[in-house]
């Protein structure tokens, strides 16, 4: 356990970095620092619900190892889709994701690591606006699939469905990320259903336009008392699909 900022070395390091780099963030586990001094970290795990404070989840592309490994029981990779699902879940809960890639002894990455990195980069190139600079919306999630809270809880795959959404917002835009693209291309976002004030709706705003990030075609959409319905047309993806809702 750390002895906190009272430790002379840590205090010197903190202020040296603050001066030389213009900022410093302390991440810690197991309540090593008093709450509020740094960013709490959950190793290979997440919170089940959104938090009002910033936090971090750290995990690896391999299920059984932080380091490069050729052992069959260690070298089991997560799918790019699963990593993006984790990213969306964490960010929607006011968290940040630290993702580890373990290099080989010569310092290079294995071909599988590079393949995953390219896949993640392709997704971020299209959908980064739902991640960078966003904040919490009124709720962070919708759907049947729940996350087990706590450390070392990400070993098993989560079977997200097309009914599972994670939400972020920025300015007048709401981002609804569908965790698994539906085979029929029909999305139903129930948290954005239409309702009058007497029904105490979760959100009572006006939808001006709906876009599907990465889909150049204009999205067809309707809104009623059941949900905001979005038709993807012919657009399909093996990765989470992000709907941008532009509001008035």
Which residues does each predicted region cover?
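Mature catalytic domains of secreted/periplasmic carbohydrate-active enzymes
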Residues: 3-248
């Amino acid at each position: 356990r750390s002895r906190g900022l009272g430790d002379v070395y840590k205090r010197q390091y903190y202020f040296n970095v603050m001066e030389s780099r213009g900022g410093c963030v302390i991440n810690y586990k197991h309540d090593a620092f008093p709450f509020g001094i740094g960013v709490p970290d959950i190793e290979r795990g997440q919170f089940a619900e959104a938090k009002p404070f910033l936090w971090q989840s750290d995990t690896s592309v391999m299920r059984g190892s932080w380091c490069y490994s050729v052992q069959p029981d260690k070298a089991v990779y997560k799918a790019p889709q699963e990593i993006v699902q984790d990213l969306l879940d964490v960010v929607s809960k006011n968290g940040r994701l630290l993702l580890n890639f373990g290099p080989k002894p010569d310092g290079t990455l294995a071909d599988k690591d590079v393949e995953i990195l390219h896949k993640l980069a392709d997704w971020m190139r299209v959908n980064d606006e739902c991640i960078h600079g966003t904040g919490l919306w009124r709720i962070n999630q919708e759907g049947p699939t729940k996350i087990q809270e706590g450390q070392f809880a990400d070993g098993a795959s989560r079977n997200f469905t097309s009914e599972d959404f994670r939400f972020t917002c920025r300015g007048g835009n709401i981002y609804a990320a569908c965790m698994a693209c539906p085979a029929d291309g029909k999305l139903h976002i129930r948290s954005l259903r239409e309702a009058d004030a007497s029904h105490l709706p979760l959100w009572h705003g006006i939808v001006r336009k709906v876009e599907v990030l990465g889909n150049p075609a204009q999205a067809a959409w309707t809104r009623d008392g059941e949900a905001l319905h979005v038709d993807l047309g012919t657009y399909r993806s093996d990765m989470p699909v992000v709907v941008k809702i532009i509001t008035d």
